[in-house]
Design a protein with these regions (language model features):
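Conserved P-loop NTPase motor cores
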Residues: 1-117
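Conserved P-loop NTPase motor module
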Residues: 117-155
C-alpha cells in the first residue's frame, strides 16, 4: 500500500515506513552451495524489488570464502555474484590474504589492486566502503569506551 500511495503522491518519502532485514552470519543462508541456490534466487528477487517497498537487506559475514566454498559450481558462483552486484553498499573489512583473489573475482573491476592489497592490513574499525561500484572510500570507525562496553567485544 505504501508504494501505491507514494506513486499517487499521497505519501511523502519522509513518511514512508522503512524496513531492513539483517542476516548476520549470512553465509549460513546464502552461498554457492547447491542446497542454498533457491535461497540465493529468492534473496536476489527481493533485493531487486525491495527499494520500491522502502526496504533493504544487510548481509554480514566474516569471511568471503564462506559465500563461495571451493567445491562450488560455476552457475551457483554466478548467482552469488549477481546477488552481491544488486547491493548498493558493500563494507569490506579485514580479510585474510588468502581471500584477496576471491574478493577480486567477486568484485571484479570495482576494487583496484592497491585496494585489494590493503584489505588484509585493515585494522580494527577500518573498512573499505564500495558504493555500487562507483566509488570506494577507506574509513575508520572510532568508538568510545561506553560503546565498547555496550557491545562487549563479542563472544
Amino acid at each position: 500500500p505504501q508504494f501505491q500511495a507514494y506513486n499517487r503522491k499521497e505519501l511523502e518519502l519522509d513518511d514512508a515506513v522503512r524496513y531492513r532485514l539483517i542476516f548476520d552470519e549470512a553465509h549460513n543462508l546464502i552461498s554457492a552451495n547447491e542446497t542454498d541456490a533457491p535461497v540465493v534466487d529468492k534473496c536476489e528477487k527481493f533485493i531487486r524489488e525491495d527499494r520500491k517497498y522502502f526496504g533493504g537487506f544487510i548481509f554480514a559475514s566474516q569471511d568471503i570464502k564462506d559465500f563461495i566454498p571451493e567445491d562450488s559450481q560455476q552457475k551457483n558462483i554466478a548467482k552469488v555474484k549477481t546477488l552481491f552486484s544488486q547491493t548498493t553498499y558493500r563494507f569490506i573489512m579485514r580479510q585474510d590474504t588468502s581471500n584477496v583473489e576471491k574478493l577480486g573475482s567477486i568484485f571484479s573491476q570495482e576494487l583496484s589492486d592497491s585496494e585489494l592489497g590493503v584489505i588484509p592490513q585493515l585494522g580494527t574499525g577500518e573498512a573499505i566502503l564500495n558504493i555500487a561500484g562507483l566509488r570506494n572510500v577507506k574509513f575508520k570507525i572510532e568508538t568510545t569506551e561506553e560503546e565498547n562496553d555496550l557491545f562487549g567485544g563479542g563472544a
